[in-house]
Every structure is written in C-alpha cells, then in structure tokens.
C-alpha cells in the first residue's frame, strides 16, 4: 500500500514488496532522509517572485550483503541540474566543477570519501568498507560483502531518457528534426554525438548535456553516457583506480516509479550499447517520491547545487554555485578566488591523492593520468564504440 500526496510523506508497506523492490525503497528512503537534513542553502528555494525551484537528487549507497542493522550506508548525496559552458574551463586549473548534475556529483563525492578513507586507513583497526593487500605501497579493495548502488530521483539525461521524453512530450513541444539537419550536431563531421535533446527520436547516440540551443555549449556528455562508460571502466576515478587493486562497479541504480516499459528502455540503453558488458546494472524501482522534484510546469531548475559526504566519523556538506563553493564565484573575465574549489573538485582530490602517494608530487594531474596506459586504452575503446564517428572532448583542465 502506498500513500503519496504532494509533498507529504509517502507511506510504503515494505513487508509486501519483493526483496529487490524493498531494497530500492530502503535506499531511496535513506538518501531522501539525508537530503532533508541539508542546510537550507543547499536546497531549492521559493524565489521572491513566488516561483518555485526544483532539483534532482542522487546518492551513492553501500549495501552490506550480510544484512544487519547497518545494511545500507550512505557514502554521498548530491543535488544539481547544471553544467557549465566548456569555455569556463580555461581558467579552472581543476577548481571548477564542469558537470554539476546530481548523479555525477554524487559519484565524485563517493570517490572523495574513498580517498579520505584510504588516507586515514589504519592497518591495525582496518576500515568498514575497504581492506589493503600486502603490496608496497599497499593497494585496496572494496570488501566482498559490500555492493554499491546509485539512487537518482529521475531518469538520467541522455539516451536512457529519450524514450520517456518522446512518450511524454506534446506534439508541439519539439520541432521535427531529420538526421540530415546539421544544427543538431556539435561537429557536423561527427554524427554520433548530438547536442542535448535535439532529434530525441534518435537512439544509441552520445549526447551532450541538455541546454538551451542559444546557450554556450558545455560539451559535457550526458549522464546516460557517463554512467555507461563507468560501468565498463569503473566508478573509481583515475586516482582511486591507482589505489585500488580491482575496479569497482555499481550493482544497482534506483529510480522512482519505474514502469516496465521505462525499465526496458533503460536496460536497452545500458546493456546493449556496449557489447559483452560483464557488470550489468540492475535497475530497482522505488515508490517514495522526491518532494523537491518538478511538480508544476511553472517550476524552474534550481541555481544551487550541493554535495554532502559521509566520512568515517563525520559528514561535511557544501553549496555549489556555478561550479565553485557558494559565495566564491567570479565572472569569467576575472581570476578565480582563493579557496573557491569544492572538496569534490579535481584540484581537491589531486591534493588529497598526493598526501597518500607523495611520490607524485611535482607532476601534473594530466601527466599522472597519461601514465595509466591500460585505463586510457579501455576508455578510448569505449568511446570508439559509443561514437564511431569520433569523440569531441571537453577543454583540457590540468592541475599543476
């Protein structure tokens, strides 16, 4: 039995649910409960004009297969619907968050949590989630009894949500676009990468983040594409990839109100675009709605993004505006302010990594990344499959 009305709590009878649906419900409840504790600066507002803002919520959870009172542990939660223009990266030096969509921020947050746990790892007492091997320097593994899940309050942008968009838009919402219409492409010579939601009838192509056609282009790829790539390469970023003995993958993605047809399109997008995928994601439904999602046509996307990280014995949260900590943004014609970077930024993660592996002090982030030949070859191979016409990268963003 489910009772959901507007923004009121949703009462769900977990006892009558299949086990996987029950797991999806439990994960969503934990993530939303943590969201409700965020400071008001980290959440959407009612603007002075009376217009209501909305946002997307995501969270990374660790599930203990052995069960127990702490079966589900939240690693990170994040909100956000924004991606910055590619041009912003020319002054970034790793300090600006280019992609502030919730699920990408949540995964960045989980990587920061893992880096923090490795930095504070004590071999004598160990760690709840990770264990080290006997190598020197030691490398780590996620303990076998833990699995990772990603909760997202709505379908990820890009290919995985195109069928839903097609089924739910009005006939006059979008102009009809033919494959020969060149304005839909970021680069007319690369017809396997489309801009945003243009030509939404077309499937199995890479898309940039959605945005107004007259806005400065972001070049950041859709969440569907990024999540799919991580399911072949690992949810670990290049820094944790170096520190872990084996890659780590998502076991579940939890999305509210997943009807059978929508779930089928999700599985088609995630399971067939990359052949022979050994680590297929299971998509779990949940009934509990996210109360700060879009509820009315007049609601507008929230300007603020946020991230909250759950470390070993404390949590920390940040409000993020225009890719930097709230209150630190400067116009693109000016240099960035000191300490503007988020704790999940490339700059902050690189600084943390060098404390763990001081032998990398003195080289840049991109130089370090270029040395990961096996990982680089894998990612290139994935890109070649997803976009046979070629890849359009974002601007270089290095940290010295």
Swiss-Prot record:
Q: Which residues form the A to I editase domain?
A: 76-400
Q: Give the residues the record marks as binding Zn(2+).
A: 101, 157, 223
Q: Which GO terms describe its molecular function?
A: metal ion binding; RNA binding; tRNA-specific adenosine deaminase activity; tRNA-specific adenosine-37 deaminase activity
As to how many cofactors bind and how, the note says: Binds 1 myo-inositol hexakisphosphate (IP6) per subunit.
- Residue ranges annotated as coiled coil are none
Q: Quote the EC number.
A: 3.5.4.34
Q: Which UniProt keywords apply?
A: Hydrolase, Metal-binding, tRNA processing, Zinc
The UniProt entry, under PROSITE patterns, shows:
A_DEAMIN_EDITASE
* Cited InterPro entries: A_deamin, Tad1
Name of the protein described by the UniProt record: tRNA-specific adenosine deaminase 1
Q: Which gene encodes it?
A: TAD1
């Amino acid at each position: 039995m489910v009772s959901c009305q507007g923004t009121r709590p949703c009462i769900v009878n977990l006892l009558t649910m299949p086990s996987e649906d029950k797991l999806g419900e439990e994960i969503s409840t934990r993530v939303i409960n943590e969201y409700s504790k965020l400071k008001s600066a980290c959440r959407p507002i009612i603007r002075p004009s009376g217009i209501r803002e909305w946002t997307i919520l995501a969270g990374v959870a660790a599930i203990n297969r052995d069960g127990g009172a702490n079966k589900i542990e939240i690693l990170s939660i994040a909100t956000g619907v924004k991606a910055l223009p590619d041009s912003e990266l020319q002054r970034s030096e790793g300090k600006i968050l280019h992609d502030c969509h919730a699920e990408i921020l949540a995964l960045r947050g989980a990587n920061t949590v893992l880096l923090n746990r490795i930095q504070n790892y004590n071999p004598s007492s160990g760690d709840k989630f990770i264990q080290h091997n006997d190598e020197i320097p030691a490398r780590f593994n996620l303990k076998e009894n833990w699995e990772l899940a990603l909760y997202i309050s709505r379908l990820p942008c890009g290919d995985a949500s195109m069928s839903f968009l097609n089924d739910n838009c009005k006939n006059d919402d979008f102009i009809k676009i033919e494959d020969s219409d060149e304005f839909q492409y970021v680069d007319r010579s690369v017809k396997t990468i489309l801009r945003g939601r243009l030509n939404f009838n077309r499937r199995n192509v890479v898309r940039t983040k959605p945005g107004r056609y007259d806005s400065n282009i972001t070049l950041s790829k859709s969440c569907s594409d990024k999540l799919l790539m991580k399911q072949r390469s690992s949810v670990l970023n290049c820094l944790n990839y170096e520190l872990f003995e084996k890659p780590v993958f998502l076991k579940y993605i939890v999305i509210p109100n997943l009807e059978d047809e929508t779930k089928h399109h999700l599985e088609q997008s995630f399971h067939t675009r990359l052949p022979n995928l050994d680590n297929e994601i299971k998509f779990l439904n949940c009934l509990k709605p996210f109360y700060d999602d879009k509820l009315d046509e007049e609601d507008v996307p929230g300007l603020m993004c946020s991230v909250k990280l759950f470390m070993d014995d404390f949590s920390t949260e940040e409000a993020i505006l225009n890719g930097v900590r709230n209150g630190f943004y400067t116009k693109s014609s000016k240099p960035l302010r000191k300490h503007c970077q988020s704790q999940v930024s490339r700059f902050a993660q690189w600084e943390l990594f060098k404390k763990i592996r001081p032998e990398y002090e003195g080289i840049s982030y991109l130089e370090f990344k270029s040395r990961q030949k096996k990982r680089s070859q894998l990612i290139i191979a994935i890109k070649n499959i997803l976009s046979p016409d070629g890849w359009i990268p974002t601007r270089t963003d290095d940290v010295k």
